[in-house]
Amino acid sequence: MTVDILRGDIAALPSADRAVELLPAAEGDSLTLACASGELKSAYRVLRAVMDYGYAHERPARVRLVCADEDAYKAYSFQWNMWFAERKPEPENES
């Protein structure tokens, strides 16, 4: 399963808090969910649910997590990079 984390408009998207319910019902190869919370524990729970489902099922092959703001984006990106990413990003040099 591929997971994309990006920022964008979440107005018409289902909440990521419903991931456990929506993953089995996903039609096709992708599912897009809205991430509104910038809380690290919430981001971890959603990503853990997505990955646990992905380990056991072929579909959806891609999950897009659209974050409402910078705080949510940072929380989801941090948890993804910390626990799930195959390769860790290079540290940014603050020169």
What is the meaning of each model-derived region?
Residues 1-17:
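N-terminal beta-strand/alpha-helix entry module and adjacent surface
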Residues 15-95:
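Phosphate/ribose-phosphate-bearing ligand recognition and processing surfaces
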